Amino acid sequence: MRYFSRRLALLVLPAMMLAGCDNQATTTSERGTLKISLADAPITFDAVNITFSEISAHINGQWITVRGQPMTVNLLEWNNGKSIVIGTSEVPAGHYTQIRLKIQDAEVVINGQTHPLEVPSGAQSGLKLAHEFTINAGSTYELVVDFDAQRSIVTTGPPNNPNGYKLNPTLRVVPKAMTGSISGIVTNPEHAAIAYAIAGIDTVTTTAVDKNSGYFMLAYLPVGTYTVALNDTIGRAFVKNDVNVVVGADQDLGMITLQ
């Protein structure tokens, strides 16, 4: 079933700032700041370490660098709506068409063992995420890039004894201003519970339930109606239909017991 995918998200936060920059010859009143943060995480590994070598945005036929220095992030540290800034730079105000993420290196840690995560040449030269957006002078615009980790990390070799791991990126982009969230507290979260937001037959996002507090947040959801499903490793589950998400608000489901 498709709702058993895990996801992580990249949060793109362009915000207006008035200061000089060398990326393009524009006046300070024509510039903004593009900030890119990493949020949410896959939850089938001990760690997923991704090294980004460059992050950029496309405007008027050229790429504007948002981050030009390598940065390694353990994706598992960012979950339940938390995010980390992985790039920020002043950029020209105007109409953008793409975000580009260059991945230099990657590895996964499973049961304490570190395995290289094979990065395709396309990811090294740049994952281009097509999404048109405009940064207006004096305004703020935010994007969320949702990276489906479960479908993006594939194994090679026998299913029960894999001999390698490959990165096959699957991503989606949504404007943050048009999103909301769903949260709750699981009363019995000790067996690696997972929460899913499902629209129709498609899993929109997934998050791990905190093992100690039982808290979870399905963040950056487009406005709409969702089915919320939870399960754990011993087969207990919970399903709630017709959960409405509205702009800028969190839909709190309260206390949930898996059965």
What are these model-derived regions, one by one?
Residues M17-G20:
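C-terminal motif of bacterial Sec signal peptides marking the signal peptidase cleavage site
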Residues M1-L10:
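Bacterial N-terminal signal peptides that target proteins for export
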